[in-house]
């Protein structure tokens, strides 16, 4: 909710919860190219630039945030989809779409009143990825 200001940023007042098939999400991760170059990728910058141009999935790790917007030690993944992948996302990979704007605005009130004990948030758990090469590429064990 940090990124859309609890549904209060202009143009981001409508909040959707999109449920995907887990296999689809993992497929996106396998196709992803980091949005920024760093030496830990193990390839030259020119090769990375070529991959970025061809890729239909961009990957970026950002700090995760607590309800007040303070950074947490864990990271949150952002994926950007385009081309045939976005078509597949829309037509095949979505299991459920929920319009949750009212719920998000209610939860924001608890945050603004500093009443976090009243927050009702989804229970999160880390996604376990068994593919060792993918885990390494995503730097999940660092």
Spans of model-derived segments:
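Long, hydrophobic N-terminal alpha-helical segment
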Residues: 1-9
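Conserved NAD+-utilizing ADP-ribose enzyme module
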Residues: 9-16, 22-142
